[in-house]
Amino acid sequence: MTTDNTNTTRNDSLAARTDTWLQSFLVWSPGQRDIIKTVALVLMVLDHINLIFQLKQEWMFLAGRGAFPLFALVWGLNLSRHAHIRQPAINRLWGWGIIAQFAYYLAGFPWYEGNILFAFAVAAQVLTWCETRSGWRTAAAILLMALWGPLSGTSYGIAGLLMLAVSYRLYRAEDRAERLALLACLLAVIPALNLASSDAAAVAGLVMTVLTVGLVSCAGKSLPRFWPGDFFPVFYACHLAVLGVLAL
């Protein structure tokens, strides 16, 4: 009995230390969030240059696998700061997605494939509808995901929605067990985003994410925010338009 109690105490202590480490590792100051977004932007641009100009550089492709998970984590943290997801913020995402779609097509992507801003909009809309616990809104959320699925081939598909949902729930979790379970889900879903491309892409996405988060968590804690609120969607649409024009 004493041995069992000792083992239980040790397990609880390990779980507590892991939870404390997790919170220090994944909760960032406004400046740290902007650093992570900047790294993600650089990785995204490298990936898009490689794809749009057909450079076929493996290192650029692999580096780009870290962009979406980093954006997703920052998005989840930002969203969790409010008691409820705000519909006006979701509406802005829908609007920017529509604007960016023209640049997405100009950059050479199929017109019927939704850009990544739509993935964020769909995820936020589904989450807010599910939080209301209304039957018709739950049905609407399921319908929205079903409609998005065939249109999301270049934006991580349903796995991308899962990544966004897990990122949000991780920061909303109120107890240790839920946080640790969601961490396990996160470590599984990040490689799953790129598993269809190759094993190397799956590993690269996880490595780039963990490496970036680890380095940023150790520095910049007192750095204030330096990007304006809508910088990412504006930059996303503009960089696609510029690359699309240059590739003509």
UniProtKB/Swiss-Prot annotation:
Membrane topology qualifier: Multi-pass membrane protein
Subcellular localization, as worded in the UniProt entry: Cell membrane
InterPro entries: TraX (IPR008875), TraX_Ftype (IPR014125)
Assigned GO CC terms: plasma membrane
A Pfam family matched in the record: TraX
Location (main, coarse): membrane
Keywords: Cell membrane, Membrane, Plasmid, Transmembrane, Transmembrane helix
Chain ranges passing through the membrane: 39-55, 180-196, 200-216, 232-248
Function per UniProt: Responsible for the N-terminal acetylation of F pilin.
Family to which the UniProt record says this protein belongs: Belongs to the TraX family.
Protein name according to UniProt: Protein TraX
Source species taxonomy: Bacteria, Pseudomonadati, Pseudomonadota, Gammaproteobacteria, Enterobacterales
